[in-house]
Regions:
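Short, conserved "active-site rim" segments that organize catalytic pockets and cofactor/ligand binding
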Residues: 1-20
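Active-site regions of enzymes building and remodeling cell-envelope glycoconjugates
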Residues: 23
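Glycine-rich phosphate- or other oxyanion-binding loops that anchor nucleotides, phosphorylated ligands
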Residues: 2, 26-174
Length: 175
């Protein structure tokens, strides 16, 4: 089993890359794929760049060329809700694209046209594994729930409240 780990920025993977026992580094699509061992697991870690398209390209390369069984996206995000603070961890149970807008066709905001689902569910086993790992740490709080993702940096309170309303979200990705 090979695990793919992606982050948008180098700072998000810096600590993991330092702990990795590197075997190879390959460049594909202007991204560096670091293959090796991390805490006894076979891993390919990649800084994919900012944006959902970069993340999608990276994920496809991980699946097609490295045969990863799962992909974990790590990185910074903005908390939604009064109890989430910098340094806390949010584990996604499902994800919604907040910038997908086909409301003109009668779809709810975030709905991908012609799909029977509003959100993308995360692998339950990976979610439980992440929760168990975080439960062992005491220097941060852990939350789980919906993460909303979009290709914009959100800083206004109005937009944050809107994201909380449409997505019933715990966290917003900063892509």
């Amino acid at each position: 089993m090979i695990l793919g780990i992606i982050g948008a920025m180098s700072e998000e993977l810096e600590i993991l890359l330092k702990d990795m026992k590197l075997e190879t580094v390959e460049e594909k699509a202007k991204m560096k794929f670091h293959k090796g061992k991390l805490w006894g697991h076979d891993v390919v870690a990649v800084v994919c760049g900012i944006g959902k398209v970069n993340a999608a390209v990276c994920t496809q390369i991980l699946a097609s060329e490295y045969n990863v069984s799962s992909v974990i996206n790590v990185g910074v995000a903005g908390g939604i809700g009064k109890d989430i603070y910098p340094g806390d961890v949010v584990i996604a149970e499902n994800l919604v694209q907040y910038d997908m807008d086909t409301t003109a066709f009668g779809d709810p905001m975030g709905q991908i046209p012609r799909m029977d689902t509003f959100d993308f569910k995360c692998d339950k086993k990976l979610v439980e594994t992440a929760k168990a790992a975080c439960a062992e740490a005491s220097d941060f709080k852990t939350f789980s729930g919906r993460i909303v993702s979009g290709d914009m940096f959100v800083a206004s309170l109005d937009k944050i409240q809107w994201l909380e309303k449409i997505g019933r979200a715990s966290c917003r990705e900063r892509v």
